Design a protein with these regions (language model features):
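Hydrophobic faces of well-ordered beta-strands that scaffold small-molecule active sites
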Residues: 28-30, 69-71, 125-127, 156, ...
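Conserved alpha/beta catalytic core and glycan-binding cleft of carbohydrate-active enzymes
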Residues: 152, 164-296, 309-313
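Carbohydrate-interacting/catalytic domains
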Residues: 1-30, 35, 49, 56-65, ...
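Surface-exposed amphipathic alpha-helices with a cationic face
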Residues: 59-62, 112-121, 166-174
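N-terminal structural segment of carbohydrate-active enzymes
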Residues: 1-99, 204, 215-229, 235-252
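Aromatic- and acidic-residue-enriched carbohydrate-binding clefts of CAZyme catalytic domains
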Residues: 43-50, 77-120, 124, 133-150, ...
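Active-site-proximal loop/turn and secondary-structure-junction residues that shape catalytic pockets
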Residues: 75-77, 100, 129-133, 162-164, ...
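A cross-domain feature marking catalytic cores of carbohydrate-active enzymes
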Residues: 34, 73, 127-133, 160-162, ...
Length: 321
C-alpha cells in the first residue's frame, strides 16, 4: 500500500495524566455539545463555546456528581452549507479536533488540555464518533486508536449498526477503552410509562433491571436528538418551524405529555405537575441498573421551546441556558 502521509503532533506535557477508569456501575454521565454547553451569554465562563469553557465548568460538573462527559462531535466539520450544521454530523475531518472550539485557535492543544483537566477532576471523557458509511473499517479503527493514544480519551460512542463498531470491540489496542452505543429502548419505555400509557409495567421492570452485554449501553430519557426534559413535560408536539422545513423534521413520536398546557405556563397546577414529572424521570434514570446519562441543562430545566431537532440552531435555542 502507498503511504500518503503521516500524522504528526507537537510534544505535549501530560503531567503524569491518569485515566480514572471507573466501572460502568459507578458512572454518572453527562451529554453535552462543546459549543452549546457554554456559548450562552449567561454561562458565566470567559471562554464561551470552547474546550476551555468546559474546563471552567468542571467544578460545577463535580458538584453535580458527574464523573463522565459524553461530547458530541469535536472534530473538524463544515458548519456552513445549504443548511447550517451545528451538531457536526455528516462527512468530516475525523482526525482533526475542531479549531473553532479552541480559545487559542489550536484544537489539538485545547482538546488535550480539556481531557487532562477532566482527568485531574476525576471525570472521564467519551467522544461521539458517528462515522459516515463511506469510512472504511480500517480508517475508523485507526481514528479511534489515534484519539485513545494521542488524546488519552477514555471512550467512544459508536453507531451500533456499523461494521467498524463490531471491529472495535475486538481490537486489542482498544481493549481497555470504553465503547458505548446509543439505544432508545430505555428512553421510549420510560417516556410511555411517565405519561401514563397502559400495559407498561412489565416492560418498565425489565428495563430497570436490564444490563447490556459486551456493548456499553447507557440509560437516558432525553438526549440531543429530541426534546429536553423540560420540553418533554411541556409539549405534546414538536415545534421545529425555525428549522425551515415546515416542521417536517425531527422525531414525530416523542411520547411526551404537556401536563395540561402546550408550552410555557404560569398555571400553578401545571407547573407543579411538570416538576413532579421531571423528578420522576430523573428517579427512573438514576436508579435503574446500568449507567445513567443526563442531557446537559436538564438538571435546571433547559428548554428548546419545543424544538426537538436543533441540528441547525447555533443560537440560544440550541444552547444550554
Amino acid at each position: 500500500h502507498e503511504v500518503r502521509g503521516i500524522l504528526e503532533t507537537e510534544t505535549y506535557d501530560w503531567e503524569n495524566d491518569e485515566l480514572p477508569s471507573y466501572a460502568n456501575s459507578d458512572v454518572v454521565a453527562y451529554n453535552l455539545h462543546v459549543r452549546g454547553f457554554t456559548k450562552d451569554p449567561y454561562s458565566q465562563v470567559s471562554a464561551k463555546g470552547t474546550f476551555e469553557g468546559v474546563i471552567e465548568k468542571l467544578p460545577y460538573l463535580k458538584e453535580l456528581g458527574i464523573n463522565q462527559i459524553h461530547c458530541m462531535p469535536v472534530y473538524e466539520f463544515e458548519e456552513r452549507g445549504r443548511v447550517p450544521n451545528y451538531w457536526g454530523y455528516g462527512e468530516a475531518y475525523y482526525f482533526a479536533p475542531k479549531s473553532a472550539y479552541s480559545a487559542c485557535g489550536n484544537g489539538v492543544i485545547s482538546l488535550k488540555n480539556m481531557v487532562k483537566a477532566c482527568h485531574e477532576a476525576g471525570i472521564e471523557v467519551v467522544l461521539e464518533m458517528p462515522f459516515e458509511g463511506n469510512v472504511s473499517v480500517m480508517e475508523a479503527i485507526e481514528c479511534l486508536r489515534y484519539y485513545r493514544m494521542e488524546y488519552h480519551v477514555d471512550g467512544f460512542i459508536l453507531n451500533p449498526c456499523m461494521e467498524a463498531t463490531r471491529a472495535a470491540f475486538s481490537d486489542p489496542a482498544l481493549k481497555d477503552t470504553k465503547l458505548l452505543v446509543h439505544r432508545t429502548d430505555f428512553q421510549d419505555i420510560m417516556r410511555r410509562f411517565l405519561k401514563g400509557d397502559e400495559g407498561m409495567i412489565e416492560a418498565v421492570m425489565y428495563w430497570l433491571r436490564h444490563l447490556g452485554g459486551e456493548e456499553g449501553i447507557f440509560n437516558y430519557i432525553t438526549s440531543h436528538t429530541g426534546f429536553t426534559l423540560n420540553d418533554l413535560v411541556s409539549y405534546d408536539g414538536k415545534h421545529n418551524e425555525a428549522n425551515g422545513e415546515n416542521n417536517q423534521d425531527g422525531p414525530d413520536y416523542n411520547y411526551s405529555w404537556n401536563c395540561g398546557a402546550e408550552g410555557p405556563s404560569r398555571k400553578k397546577a401545571v407547573c407543579a405537575l411538570r416538576n413532579r414529572q421531571i423528578k420522576n424521570a430523573l428517579f427512573l434514570v438514576l436508579l435503574a441498573q446500568g449507567t445513567p446519562c443526563l442531557l446537559a441543562g436538564d438538571e435546571f430545566g433547559n428548554s428548546q421551546r419545543g424544538n426537538n431537532n436543533v441540528y441547525c440552531q447555533d443560537n440560544p435555542t440550541g444552547w444550554v441556558n
